[in-house]
């Protein structure tokens, strides 16, 4: 078994690292210069074929500001390299008539008889959302979920509601050992207008399935800043967010990595 981590080094391209045992370290970065864009994500099919999906410019001429595309490459697992040329599988986004913007953050899954492509759309501000498509093969043809978006806080909600959570999107899905599906995504808690001191928070919500499509949150339903604890297997480590107690004697030569977080204090 091999573990992979792929990401964007802004201004320098996209790369991945791999490991047989993440606890013992990772390979040197392996750059993928064929990827022209951001947000790369791996998918490895049951037959061993690898794929990379990512955000990139549309093929040909851009028709409006904010129009982007989702591209797919085949990936050679043995050669650690991309095979051939990309294929544009989403152009602009879903429901293209109103000119959707900033389709990005793609993830590819194989669930049942379909391949699912889940993407963020609308930018990471107040119009942020998550949309999904499905196809019989990773190369398509892709069918949009008629009920997109499957997660958003942009419409049908009062801006004066208490404990406002906004800008929800950039999600990923995982199935637990008990068979339940969960989604993690980012959202923000503004204290006024579009200002927030905590940046982007990470949220967890259950995923429900209907007619072969996943839904993270009903349209018009507000995200609660506090949810019920998920009945998932604990990893035995003390949490470092939310309400928690943690003791550190600081008797080692190096600071525990648990103290690395957004906006570290200078002392």
Q: At which residue positions do the language-model features occur?
A:
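Carbohydrate-active catalytic/glycan-binding domains of CAZyme proteins
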Residues: 1-267
């Amino acid at each position: 078994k091999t573990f992979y981590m792929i990401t964007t080094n802004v201004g320098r391209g996209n790369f991945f690292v791999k490991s047989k045992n993440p606890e013992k370290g990772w390979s040197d970065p392996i750059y993928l210069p064929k990827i022209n864009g951001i947000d790369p994500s791996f998918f490895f099919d049951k037959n061993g074929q690898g794929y990379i999906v990512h955000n990139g410019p549309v093929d040909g001429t851009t028709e409006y500001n904010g129009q982007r595309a989702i591209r797919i490459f085949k990936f050679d697992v043995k050669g650690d390299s991309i095979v051939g040329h990309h294929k544009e599988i989403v152009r602009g986004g879903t429901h293209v008539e109103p000119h959707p913007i900033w389709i990005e953050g793609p993830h590819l899954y194989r669930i049942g008889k379909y391949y699912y492509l889940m993407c963020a759309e609308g930018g990471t501000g107040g119009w942020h959302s998550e949309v999904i498509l499905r196809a019989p093969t990773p190369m398509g043809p892709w069918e949009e979920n008629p009920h997109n978006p499957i997660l958003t806080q942009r419409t049908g909600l009062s801006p004066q509601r208490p404990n406002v959570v906004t800008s929800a999107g950039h999600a990923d899905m995982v199935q637990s050992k008990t068979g339940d599906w969960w989604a993690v995504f980012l959202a923000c808690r503004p204290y006024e207008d579009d200002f927030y001191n905590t940046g982007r928070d990470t949220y967890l919500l259950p995923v429900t399935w209907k007619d072969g499509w996943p839904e993270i949150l009903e349209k018009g339903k507000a995200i609660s800043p506090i949810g019920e604890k998920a009945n998932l297997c604990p990893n035995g480590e003390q949490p470092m967010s939310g309400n928690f107690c943690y003791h550190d004697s600081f008797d080692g030569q190096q600071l525990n990595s648990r103290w690395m977080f957004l906006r570290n204090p200078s002392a």
